[in-house]
Design a protein with these regions (language model features):
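Alpha-helical transmembrane segments and their helix-start/interface "positive-inside/aromatic belt" motifs
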Residues: 3-23
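Alpha-helical transmembrane segments of multi-pass membrane proteins
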Residues: 21-35
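Membrane-helix boundary elements
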Residues: 32-64
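Pore-lining and gate-forming transmembrane alpha-helices of multi-pass membrane transport proteins
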Residues: 56-64, 110-113, 117-133
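Membrane-helix boundary/juxtamembrane motif in polytopic membrane proteins
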Residues: 79-100, 150-154
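Terminal transmembrane helical module of multi-pass membrane proteins
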Residues: 126-154
């Protein structure tokens, strides 16, 4: 691995740790942030009432669960990349699991559209990212097969 790739991997690892720390901070501060958001941006047509605040807060915490899983999986994938273990079946599996986390986020944000219509856009973005990651996992699988064949022929 050349110096540029090592630097990029280290930056990605650092950003992943920042992401995970941000998720922890968000989990701690979520009730206050949500109350502030609703009080600041509540319009007449907003469907979040005090009765449904608990439902929205629960959905917000549900959004964090796949985020934590995806962050941990990304840290593991970056560890594999730094060791040069890219074209291997476990790497493709990790990418597929991250895609599943994206699909989970898609479903949760689709539920959010009842309260916040902008969540539909986020849901479609998560769906697109999940599909793209499945394609990348398939490419890694093909690359793994080619690498295995080359290892046997050399």
């Amino acid at each position: 691995m050349n110096a540029s790739m090592k630097r990029t991997t280290r930056i990605a690892q650092a950003l992943t740790l920042v992401l995970l720390a941000g998720l922890v901070a968000l989990a701690i501060c979520l009730p206050w942030l949500l109350r502030g958001y609703i009080s600041k941006f509540a319009y007449e047509n907003t469907t979040v009432s005090s009765a449904s605040f608990g439902i929205v807060l629960t959905l917000c915490y549900c959004v964090l669960i796949p985020g934590f899983f995806a962050g941990g999986l990304m840290a593991g994938l970056l560890r594999r990349v730094s060791r040069g273990l890219i074209f291997a079946a476990p790497s493709a599996l990790i990418i597929r699991l991250i895609a599943i986390c994206c699909f989970a986020e898609c479903a949760i944000f689709a539920l959010f559209t009842v309260y916040f219509t902008v969540s539909l856009g986020i849901s479609f973005c998560a769906l697109f990212l999940g599909i793209a990651l499945l394609v990348v996992a398939s490419v890694i699988d093909v690359g793994t097969e080619i690498k295995t064949e080359n290892d046997y022929t050399v």
